[in-house]
Amino acid sequence: MQPQELKTIMGSGLLSFPLTDFDSEGHFNARGYAERLEWLAPYGASALFAAGGTGEFFSLTADEYPAIIETAVQTCRGKVPIIAGAGGPTRFAIQCAQAAEKAGAHGILLLPHYLTEAGQEGLAAHVEAVCKSVKFGVIVYNRGQSRFTPETLARLAERNANLVGFKDGVGDIELMNSIYMKMGDRFAYLGGLPTAEVYAAAYKALGTPVYSSAVFNFIPKTAMDFYHAVANDDQATQHRLLRSFFMPYLALRNRMPGYAVSIVKAGAKIVGHDAGPVRAPLTDLKADEMAALKALIDQLGPQ
């Protein structure tokens, strides 16, 4: 896929990050992962991110990563595009990006580098090294210690034609507005704060009409209903779902650092699509939290 095709896909509808399936001993479960993708594919996401943040990229080994991307590409070929997560140290990010390209992914989401802080010059060098290592499209993720200024993004865009997307996980409205005003349609933009539905209407007003949904992993129909409500400026439906599900869900998610991933795996287990346990240092939800989440899911009706 050409980079501009990835850009078009990014702007065409709801995106999501499938969970990565692990067995009871914590090993990658390829069969379970393929079955998950087969279940989710028909619901209408414009693309799925394999081995993204919700897919616990941070816990994957260099051997597991290619197997996950290959499984996703083979399972979803002809059904839904696969964008691979890639990140960490520059050389490892390049290794992941090249493995994803070889496997047939449609592009990568460049996740934040690991641990160390860096200035804009260093961040730019990191992104450019990854962009230069592949031919397909790259989406840069503005999150954590990887925070980019409009000027840095403009320089990167000028030097790297395959840098076609910008995902924001910071939530700095002034910065987001500045980036959009400077870059315009050079990038496709994606809302990427945890539980992105809560911020979707505000981001749409900033020129970012699409986002990635984590809850699509266990309530895909509701996730699509909410996305269509945002797209159609249906505030009544948005407010109903925010009040009845998303705000109580947010309160439950915020009980523990790392629950942004754990609660999604819990939801998948509740609806009969168990992806196994989360990997340390994440922890699974407690029994009372599982019960509270089940009550929230049950009142939404069939998916």
Curated annotation (Swiss-Prot):
Swiss-Prot/TrEMBL keywords: Lyase
GO molecular function: 4-hydroxy-tetrahydrodipicolinate synthase activity; 5-dehydro-4-deoxyglucarate dehydratase activity
KW Cytoplasm (keyword) present: no
Catalyzed reaction equations: 5-dehydro-4-deoxy-D-glucarate + H(+) = 2,5-dioxopentanoate + CO2 + H2O
Entry annotated with the keyword tRNA processing: no
Disulfide-bonded cysteines: none
Domain of life of the native organism: Bacteria
GO biological process, one term: D-glucarate catabolic process
Entry EC no(s): 4.2.1.41
Pathway(s): Carbohydrate acid metabolism; D-glucarate degradation; 2,5-dioxopentanoate from D-glucarate: step 2/2
Family: Belongs to the DapA family.
Alphabetized NCBIfam families for the sequence: KdgD, PRK03620.1
PANTHER family per record: 5-DEHYDRO-4-DEOXYGLUCARATE DEHYDRATASE 2-RELATED, DIHYDRODIPICOLINATE SYNTHASE
Name assigned to this protein: Probable 5-dehydro-4-deoxyglucarate dehydratase
